[in-house]
């Protein structure tokens, strides 16, 4: 059985491949998400939704990422890190049922596995700053399971 971690890894790979080849997003989605995750429809559906939402949100996510990636232009960030930051930012903005801590932790762990030795720390710093800023702006709209851990974010935002 596949997990949401598997889904996120496949979406990261699909975003990366799509960006590197300027390819057909639907073809990439089919090859890199639908086929590997075919055995678990709920995981596949989550992956497809995350991929599509990340593409739709990319311009907004890039602006947010650049604001918090001190001294980094979006195109200079390692491609895998960029894909992960876009995914995590999209989850924070658009996935009401996903707790922010899950989005952040998953991005960090996937960065450690697939990117450079320093990527986990870099992704952590950027996405943490994004998380606190979105909270301060009232843009974290979480419901149900997505509310898990929100009290910790509120405490951290109050102390910064």
From Swiss-Prot:
One of its GO terms (molecular function) is RNA binding. Keywords: RNA-binding, Transcription, Transcription antitermination, Transcription regulation. InterPro entries: NusB-like_sf, NusB_fam, NusB_RsmB_TIM44. NCBIfam families: nusB. GO terms for cellular component: cytosol. GO terms for biological process: DNA-templated transcription termination; transcription antitermination. Belongs to the NusB family. Involved in transcription antitermination. Required for transcription of ribosomal RNA (rRNA) genes. Binds specifically to the boxA antiterminator sequence of the ribosomal RNA (rrn) operons. The keyword Transcription applies. Transmembrane segments: none annotated. This is Transcription antitermination protein NusB.
């Amino acid at each position: 059985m596949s997990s949401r971690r598997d889904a996120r890894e496949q979406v990261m790979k699909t975003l990366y491949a799509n960006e590197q080849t300027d390819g057909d997003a639907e073809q990439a989605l089919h090859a890199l998400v639908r086929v590997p995750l075919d055995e678990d429809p709920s995981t596949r559906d989550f992956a497809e939704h995350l991929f599509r939402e990340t593409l739709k949100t990319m311009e907004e996510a890039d602006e947010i990422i650049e604001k918090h990636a001190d001294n980094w232009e979006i195109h200079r960030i390692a491609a895998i890190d960029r894909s992960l930051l876009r995914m995590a930012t999209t989850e924070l903005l658009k996935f009401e049922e996903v707790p922010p801590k899950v989005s952040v932790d998953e991005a960090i762990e996937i960065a450690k596995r697939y990117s450079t030795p320093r990527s986990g720390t870099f992704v952590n710093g950027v996405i943490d700053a994004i998380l606190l800023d979105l909270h301060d702006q009232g843009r974290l709209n979480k419901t149900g399971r997505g509310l898990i851990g929100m009290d910790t974010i509120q405490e951290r935002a109050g102390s910064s």
